[in-house]
Amino acid sequence: MVLIRVLANLLILQLSYAQKSSELIIGGDECNINEHRFLVALYTSRSRRFYCGGTLINQEWVLTAAHCDRKNIRIKLGMHSEKVPNEDAQTRVPKEKFFCLSSKTYTKWDKDIMLMRLKRPVNNSTHIAPVSLPSNPPSVGSVCRVMGWGTITSPQETYPDVPHCANINILDYEVCQAAHGGLPATSRTLCAGILKGGKDSCKGDSGGPLICNGQFQGIASWGAHPCGQSLKPGVYTKVFDYTEWIQSTIAGNTDATCPP
């Protein structure tokens, strides 16, 4: 039964690749300036280069990957071009950071999620607006949009001035199990990509959003290197599984626990 599902996913993804082969993050297309108002870029006070992405979920909170944690994080909102900033672009620093575990431990398949409270809230503007948490998990075969300022070539790194976007698909978890050794039987992650290769998130895209049918479903966590290999889809933290923890933390319950 698993083999049948995997083969069915391969057919779906091959058809998607044939239809959308020009849309790549690795060597791919610039995002529309109006489609990523919730996308934020993370950098540190020591380096101006964006090293991770994140997602604005309300005027005061940003969601990203736990492995994107650094000292002296700076959060850039309302950005498109780094060289020519939008007039409404803003910079914030985190007031608080929240992790699933107090030890900040996470694995490639578990709890790679970090919630940051901004020191000062932001207002909606032309290029800044939050995205809602998902009301339901995505289904296998869903077309999703991945985006970020990560490298557009791999293994050599080429960082773009503007965010790049690509359409990828939700796959059965078993596809990622077959592609990446060591994954457990179940995990709170999503498997997403194009089995034929060419479309993928990459270094610098970590922590950024996976948007499926208009809903924020995933956080870019990890994948193969070089990026964009055939039969090597990416792994994304499954946001839906953490919505209760996120909402409880935002409501002030700092003792909220993540799902086991």
From Swiss-Prot:
Disulfide bonds join C31-C165, C52-C68, C100-C258, C144-C212, C176-C191, C202-C227. One of its GO terms (molecular function) is serine-type endopeptidase activity. Keywords: Disulfide bond, Glycoprotein, Hemostasis impairing toxin, Hydrolase, Protease, Secreted, Serine protease, Signal, Toxin, Zymogen. Glycans are attached at N123, N124. It is found in: Secreted. One of its GO terms (cellular component) is extracellular region. Gene3D superfamilies: Trypsin-like serine proteases. Residues 1-18 form the signal peptide. This is Snake venom serine protease gussurobin. The lineage of its organism: Eukaryota, Metazoa, Chordata, Craniata, Vertebrata.
